[in-house]
Amino acid sequence: MPSAHSVKLRPLEREDLRYVHQLDNNASVMRYWFEEPYEAFVELSDLYDKHIHDQSERRFVVECDGEKAGLVELVEINHVHRRAEFQIIISPEYQGKGLATRAAKLAMDYGFTVLNLYKLYLIVDKENEKAIHIYRKLGFSVEGELMHEFFINGQYRNAIRMCIFQHQYLAEHKTPGQTLLKPTAQ
């Protein structure tokens, strides 16, 4: 697993859009994302411009030893209800090395301690066993199953909604006197 010092999050910048575009257009990366792979770069640029000051989302680039290794996003941030949707993509060459767990913890620390969110939730394909295993390891629990939620490759797919609450996360990952890891983008 990458060391604590080799993994960090930083805010998504315009210069990162080519990297994001490569991830978005990789069918193996996007197969569990319930979205069509393949979007035009101009569409991605327009989305970036439209949402650059949107307070309902925080998007981070995951870096491992200074190299771009994935994306972590807190989207649909609702400050009244103190919740957000958690999303993560790790580049194929960095998968299986514990990076998703490290990056997720950094984003969760940010969500629960900086944004003071009460709840993080996610939607995952029921058949994505690797992701579900990682999410359970991080403390997420199943809230329910969404039947025939997404139409992908000619068939409907079920999804699982999972969540974790601030008090659960802090009890598991913060001890008295310990400083939580923070993304560099505070």
From Swiss-Prot:
GO terms for molecular function: diamine N-acetyltransferase activity; identical protein binding; magnesium ion binding. This is Spermidine N(1)-acetyltransferase. Acetyl-CoA binds at residues 88-90, 95-101, 128-137. It holds the Pfam family Acetyltransf_3. Disruption phenotype: Cells lacking this gene accumulate spermidine at late stationary phase and show a reduced cell viability due to a decrease in protein biosynthesis. At 37 degrees Celsius, growth of mutant is normal in the presence of 0.5 or 1 mM spermidine. However, following a shift to 7 degrees Celsius, the addition of 0.5 or 1 mM spermidine results in inhibition of cellular growth or cell lysis, respectively. Its EC number is 2.3.1.57. One of its GO terms (cellular component) is protein-containing complex. Changing residue 135 to A: 300-fold decrease in activity with spermine as substrate. Retains the ability to inhibit PrprA activity. It comes from the Bacteria. Acetylation neutralizes the charge of the polyamine, which is then typically excreted from the cell. SUPFAM superfamilies: Acyl-CoA N-acyltransferases (Nat). Residues 7-167 form the N-acetyltransferase domain. GO terms for biological process: coenzyme A metabolic process; polyamine catabolic process; spermidine catabolic process; spermine catabolic process. It comes from Escherichia coli (strain K12). The level of spermidine acetyltransferase activity increases at low temperature to prevent spermidine toxicity. Spermidine binds at residues 35, 43. Transmembrane segments: none annotated. Signal peptide: none annotated. Heat shock, alkaline shift, ethanol treatment and poor nutrient availability produce increased concentrations of monoacetylated spermidine. Inhibited by alkaline phosphatase, N(1),N(8)-bis(ethyl)spermidine (BESPD) and N(1),N(12)-bis(ethyl)spermidine (BESPM). Mg(2+) binds at residues 35, 76. Induction: Constitutively expressed throughout log and plateau phases of growth. NCBIfam families: PRK15130.1.
